[in-house]
């Protein structure tokens, strides 16, 4: 799919729906600083600190549009991009203790040419008291910017410690896919298919949040540059 086709699909999801916004709460905005931009175990910022701004706007019952902009400082992984802009739509449905979510997202890379790509996803979550479990599948169809297609399957859990502002979480994920251009496919899967995993502790107090996360992959050298074990710290403010 072309970049315009992806953007059109995402925007059409929420077209003509703002009038129904009374079914949802208001928009939320967050600014955050982080010691690294790690996604699926890979550093998108070449191991450098980043700043990020995110926004989520509800447009109907269960439906929201969201966007995020993150500094990348000339990321080698993404063709020297100065930033990544993530644009998406999410639809969530609560069924008893289960929460089902469908999403579509496009990643733009200002400062780099022919790097943008889109993906769709589905998440099934279940909550029991302060604990929750999520199973997710996200798929990027074949696109020249990623040298083929990409499938990411993951499982995660979180536990809000009663009586404290702390939440513990962990996840494991698997990246795989068809390769049409091996050199380009290394962008999202250096060395081929791989596992990533991590654990985190986050603190929430009012509009403030902070956290520390351990991230790692099973990618072997020499493909493991900025894909190995690391600690990532962050602090954020929402309004």
Tell where the protein language model's regions lie, with residue ranges.
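Transmembrane beta-barrel strands of outer-membrane/channel proteins
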Residues: 29-35, 67-71, 102-106, 124, ...
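Short glycine/proline- and aromatic-enriched beta-strand/turn motifs that initiate or cap beta-hairpins
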Residues: 21-73
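Hydrophobic, lipid-facing positions within transmembrane beta-strands of outer-membrane proteins
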Residues: 27, 49-55, 85-87, 100, ...
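Outer-membrane beta-barrel translocator domains and adjoining extracellular loop/strand segments
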Residues: 39-46, 76-82, 113-118, 145-150, ...
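Outer-membrane beta-barrel "beta-signal"
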Residues: 203-206, 225-239
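Repeated loop/turn-to-beta-strand initiation elements of outer-membrane beta-barrel proteins
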Residues: 27-29, 61-67, 96-102, 129-135, ...
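Residue-level signature of outer-membrane beta-barrel architecture
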Residues: 35, 57-59, 91-93, 106, ...
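Detector for outer-membrane/organellar transmembrane beta-barrel domains
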Residues: 117-186
């Amino acid at each position: 799919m072309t970049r315009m086709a992806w953007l059109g699909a995402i925007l059409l999801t929420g077209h003509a729906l703002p009038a129904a916004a009374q079914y949802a709460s208001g928009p939320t905005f967050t600014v955050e600083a982080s010691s690294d931009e790690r996604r699926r175990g890979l550093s998108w910022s070449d191991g450098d600190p980043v700043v990020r701004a995110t926004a989520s706007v509800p447009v109907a019952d269960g439906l929201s549009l969201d966007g995020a902009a993150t500094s990348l400082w000339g990321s080698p992984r993404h063709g020297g991009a100065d930033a990544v802009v993530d644009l998406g739509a999410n639809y969530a449905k609560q069924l008893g203790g289960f929460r089902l979510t469908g999403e579509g997202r496009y990643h733009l890379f200002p400062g780099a040419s022919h790097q943008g790509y889109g993906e769709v996803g589905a998440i099934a979550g279940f909550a029991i008291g302060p604990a929750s479990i999520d199973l997710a599948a996200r798929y990027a169809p074949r696109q020249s910017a990623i040298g083929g297609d990409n499938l990411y399957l993951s499982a995660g859990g979180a536990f809000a410690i009663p009586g404290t502002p702390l939440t513990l979480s962990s996840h494991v994920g698997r990246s795989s896919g068809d390769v049409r251009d091996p050199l380009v496919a290394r962008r999202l899967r250096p060395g081929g298919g791989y596992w990533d995993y991590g654990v985190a502790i986050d603190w929430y107090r009012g509009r403030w949040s902070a956290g520390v996360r351990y991230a790692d992959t099973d990618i072997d050298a020499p493909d493991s540059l900025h894909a190995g074990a690391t600690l990532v710290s962050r602090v954020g403010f929402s309004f």
